[in-house]
Amino acid sequence: MSIADIRTDYAQADLSETDTAADPVTQFAKWFDEALHAEVPEPNAMGVSTVGENGRPSSRIVLIKDFDQRGFTWFTNYDSRKGRELEKNPYAALLFHWIALEREVRIEGRVERVSAEESEQYFQSRPVKSRLSAIASAQSAPIADRAALEAQYAKVEAQHGDSTPRPPHWGGYRLQPEYVEFWQGRRSRLHDRIAYTLQKDGQWTRQRLQP
């Protein structure tokens, strides 16, 4: 079979303006809850896209750890590529793709670091081996081989044991949404797209987009 011949005709659900909430965070919470109940694999996995000083984008999958009216929060190494790019250009795009429900959510906005207290609280809630990995890994930096990486981990484990201080270069980011789009697959590629845009007065406008 040719790659060009691979296609699915989506028919599970529809999405109308009257079905959606007045604000996108409430609507996202509804869809996220439905993804959980549908047992979608890792519904908290999202693509995070950033842009470097050279104007070139980069993307990776990250796990969201919280969301509320303040924004969408994840944690990472501030010295990683995404961290360095966000320091220079504090805007990002998030993408959730729940293929089992034929749904997608795109979120764009400005990104800020969360407080040190919030980062500390989450870091200490992680499994100890995850905390050790965060200390041992200089994320995005080259390394000779797997053995060298495991040696770094073993050294950190011997040094800290279960007492794992949060590294100063590790913490959270929160994206404050300015644009959110909900996509529902439909038959014949006539998909439903409902977009929310944040206005200067803090209110959200909502409109349907052509597929």
From Swiss-Prot:
| Cofactor binding mode and count | Binds 1 FMN per subunit.
Q: What class of enzyme is it?
A: oxidoreductase
Q: Which domain of life is it from?
A: Bacteria
Q: Which residues bind substrate?
A: R7, T8, D9, Y10, K65, Y122, R126, S130, R189, L190, H191
Q: Which cofactor does the UniProt annotation name?
A: FMN
Give a yes or no for keyword Flavoprotein in this entry.
yes
- Disulfide bonds, which pairs? none
GO MF terms, alphabetically ordered: FMN binding; pyridoxamine phosphate oxidase activity
Q: What is its EC number?
A: 1.4.3.5
Pathway membership: Cofactor metabolism; pyridoxal 5'-phosphate salvage; pyridoxal 5'-phosphate from pyridoxamine 5'-phosphate: step 1/1; Cofactor metabolism; pyridoxal 5'-phosphate salvage; pyridoxal 5'-phosphate from pyridoxine 5'-phosphate: step 1/1
Q: Which UniProt keywords apply?
A: Flavoprotein, FMN, Oxidoreductase, Pyridoxine biosynthesis
Name the residues that bind FMN: R60, I61, V62, L63, I64, K65, F75, T76, R81, K82, Q139, S140, W183, R193
Hey, which family's this protein in?
Answer: Belongs to the pyridoxamine 5'-phosphate oxidase family.
User: Which purpose does this protein serve, as stated in its record?
Assistant: Catalyzes the oxidation of either pyridoxine 5'-phosphate (PNP) or pyridoxamine 5'-phosphate (PMP) into pyridoxal 5'-phosphate (PLP).
Name the NCBIfam families on file: pdxH (TIGR00558), PRK05679.1 (NF004231)
Subunit description? Homodimer.
Q: Can you name this protein?
A: Pyridoxine/pyridoxamine 5'-phosphate oxidase
